Amino acid sequence: MYKTCVWVLLFKIVLCYEAPPATLEAIHPKGLRVSVPDEGFSLFAFHGKLNEEMEGLEAGHWSRDITKPKNGRWIFRDRNAALKIGDKIYFWTFVIKDGLGYRQDNGEWTVEGFVDEAGNPVNTEGSEITPGVEFTSTSLNPESPQSIPNQPPDNLPAKPPSEGYPCELSLSTVSVPGFVCKGQLLFEDQFNIPIHRGKIWVPEVKFPGEPDFPFNVYLSDNAEVNDGKLIIKPATLESKYGEDFVRQSLDLSERCTGTVGTAQCLREASGPLILPPIITAKISTRHQFAFKYGRVEIRAKMPKGDWLYPEILLEPRDNIYGVRNYASGILKIASVKGNAEFSKKLYAGPIMTGSDPYRSFYLKENIGYESWNNDFHNYTLEWRPDGITLLVDGESYGEIKPGEGFYNVANSYKVEAAPQWLKGTIMAPFDELFYVSIGLNVAGIREFSEDISNKPWKNSATKAMLKFWDARSQWFPTWDEDSALQVDYVKVFAI
């Protein structure tokens, strides 16, 4: 079985320790016992539901942290559980070993018999079963990974180090159970194995849409790992599907990661409304890792080529404040447009609406001596409960402070979502869980302003995508091997 290991969470990819599978026992006449052998743990946690599947890593009907072993085992005991033959328990467990956490995920166990307090199989009348009769006490879903390293459960109260915490607790929180230590590495991927094997990233398969409406479709084939780097390349739709395919239809529904039945998964060309003529890719940690507050470091080489721009983002996992027009915000970690005339301008920061002037109100710029896409650079975004700091190669170039809240300025610009942010903290909408996403976009109706002299389309025009495609003899020659977005590593630290 392939296993993963991390500092704090799921995501430093090396072979490592595997949490022991739990043994579940139905006690006669009443009760449930769950245990694992003591292998030097400092904590054991059990979370489960009776006859109801778990929703991810929820607490469950049973939610207990055990801090001491007994007779060589860590034991959870519910003396009031009234179980019967055929009942099914869905569960996950968690252990801490040598300061790192490990989970047994997606556990399923069906009551097939009972034991007494000593663990001897008994019948429903309470008499001991004759030795030799088979008795099954534990079962796992074989299709699911059994052990995924992570950090200790976050439903534990904050305790000082003297009461069991080995560190100063962080302001950061994460999407999987765990206390977080200040400065601790939460996530790391150095892209040493294919994306699908790590099972950390989800490649998007869909047509991106509002509010930016880029002129590309995301397909998984255009993201690959090569020589320790993530490579995302642009390619024409015709290179994959044939000449003039932009005037056909493309149905991604069977593997679409967007909303099936919408334009995210199915497009049909009609007159001047052609299909997005470029294929790119986007990957995200949406299903595996999200966090609130931390420092993101990404070493990347930006793409060269007209009308290309990278999307290196933090995106909201739950869209608490709304879905449309970035109502729940996005954080640009770094972006550089691929056109030569823009390649010395690095920009990043928070975006909270789809259109200017407020869209770019908080974006910060760093004008380089040379083009940012000539080489790899270290791009950093530090996200705190009181603001955001942007750095490149260790040098700060931007600071964003919310003041009394982002609402005040947004409301003066008549941003529709602004009143929703009053429900949160002064950092709203940036006070919820966000995940990491990395992608490549082409053109669209927001990133390139109308005053660019050689731009072949108007953002507001119905024929915008067609005009872009018809001008390919102008921009396509600027694309080559350097037009790929290359990422060396991604790291997320607690603050």
Curated annotation (Swiss-Prot):
SUPFAM superfamilies listed in its UniProt record: Concanavalin A-like lectins/glucanases
Induction profile: By bacterial and yeast infection.
Residues with attached carbohydrate: 378
Effect of residue 77 to A: Decreased binding affinity to curdlan to less than 60% of the wild-type
Effect caused by changing residue 82 to Q: Decreased binding affinity to curdlan to less than 80% of the wild-type
Limits of the CBM39 domain: 17-116
Record's protein name: Beta-1,3-glucan-binding protein
Origin species: Bombyx mori (Silk moth)
